[in-house]
């Protein structure tokens, strides 16, 4: 099989010392190459070239670094879809050092979007996820490294995890952006005698990217302007556990709510929207009101969160897995026999 693959090696995106997306994908590609498959690659933020660079050939299979981002990437994705070729998307997974792999798109267009609530019922019992949960909590292990330890204000607050300002999950799946969510949540909190605690996105810490600088300026202005808005950089689990609830657009930190068994509201259409693990409402005022009034079944949400954690741990492609297991899971998610 002739395979075209998007490769990226950008550690800052994960807030880590290396990019585990590249570590996992290059291992898979090398094994498939050993089995007789051939590769060309499109490179993103990379100087090294482990495979011949993509020109304009015809391929049997396209492994895409998400169908979003640069126009050339979107055009390539659409080209191979239109041609009836199998296309698999991948990006950072929700668990530490993992990949999300999907035969359609990501977020609210995932292959699993409409069926995930039923799929996670495979979990034998919610308690089956407890060993996984405790390991993550005790090790303070999140999708991204948790290093800072700012003091958390002794107030009642709504927690907002930072996201990339123009992230694909926001631009493509929410009518309300991060700035809009922050503004509306600050106003809502003031009306109800609450504060807002905001944790900056760890992948943007120290970044000189224009979007990162724009976001830093925005959050600094909000802290200066609103006395009930606090920027706090510490363990995301601690921030979630002490909050009244979490409010986000469509954040990868939803998995941290799942691990910490805490309620989360999303105004963007996420992978988790129909799973029973989150409250999804594109109307921010309405969603915040639902959360504050606790107009949902919290015990049911917690059980669904545990089932989801079990399912993700069982079926996500993770760096620690043997290569045969990674290929087995990749085949399951992609629908492509390798």
What is the role of each PLM region?
Residues 5-14, 149-206, 309-314:
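Active-site donor-nucleotide binding/catalytic segment of nucleotide-sugar enzymes
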Residues 39, 43-44, 183-232:
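Catalytic donor nucleotide-activated moiety binding site of glycosyltransferases and closely related
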Residues 61-75, 232-279:
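A donor-sugar binding/catalytic signature common to diverse glycosyltransferases
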Residues 22-31, 40-102:
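Extended catalytic core of nucleotide-activated donor transferases of GT-like folds
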Residues 1-58, 191, 333-338:
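N-terminal pre-catalytic "stem/leader" segment of glycosyltransferase-like enzymes
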Residues 104-152, 276-338:
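Leloir-type glycosyltransferase catalytic cores
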Residues 55, 151, 238-242:
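Structural alpha-helical scaffold elements that stabilize or flank donor/cofactor-binding regions
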Residues 9-12, 46-49, 67-70, 93-96, ...:
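Short, solvent-exposed loop/turn segments at secondary-structure junctions
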């Amino acid at each position: 099989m002739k395979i075209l693959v998007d490769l990226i090696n950008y550690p800052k995106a994960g807030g880590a010392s290396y990019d585990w997306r590249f570590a996992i994908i290059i291992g898979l590609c090398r094994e498939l190459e050993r089995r007789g498959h051939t590769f060309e690659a499109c490179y993103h933020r990379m100087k090294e070239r482990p495979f011949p660079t993509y020109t304009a050939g015809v391929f049997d299979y396209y492994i895409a670094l998400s169908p979003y981002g640069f126009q050339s990437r979107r055009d390539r994705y659409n080209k191979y879809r239109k041609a009836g070729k199998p296309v698999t998307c991948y990006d950072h997974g929700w668990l530490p050092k993992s990949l999300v792999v999907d035969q359609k798109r990501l977020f609210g267009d995932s292959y699993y979007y409409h069926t995930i609530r039923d799929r996670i019922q495979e979990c034998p019992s919610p308690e089956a996820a407890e060993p996984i949960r405790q390991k993550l909590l005790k090790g303070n292990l999140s999708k991204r490294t948790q290093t800072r330890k700012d003091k958390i204000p002794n107030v009642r607050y709504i927690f907002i995890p930072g996201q990339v300002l123009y992230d694909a999950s926001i631009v493509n799946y929410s009518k309300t952006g991060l700035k809009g969510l922050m503004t509306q949540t600050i106003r809502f909190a003031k009306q109800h005698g609450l504060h807002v605690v905001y944790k900056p996105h760890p992948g943007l810490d120290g970044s000189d990217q224009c979007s990162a600088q724009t976001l830093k300026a925005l959050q600094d202005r909000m802290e200066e302007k609103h006395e009930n808005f606090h920027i706090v950089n510490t363990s995301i689990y601690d921030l979630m556990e002490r909050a009244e609830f979490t409010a986000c657009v469509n954040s990868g930190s939803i998995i941290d709510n799942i691990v910490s068994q805490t309620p989360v509201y999303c105004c963007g259409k996420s992978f988790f929207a129909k799973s029973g693990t989150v409250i999804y409402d594109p109307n921010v005022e309405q969603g915040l009101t639902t959360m504050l009034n606790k107009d949902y079944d919290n015990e049911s949400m917690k059980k669904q969160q545990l089932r989801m954690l079990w399912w993700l741990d069982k079926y996500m492609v993770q760096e620690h897995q043997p290569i045969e297991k990674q290929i087995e899971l990749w085949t399951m998610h992609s629908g492509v026999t390798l």
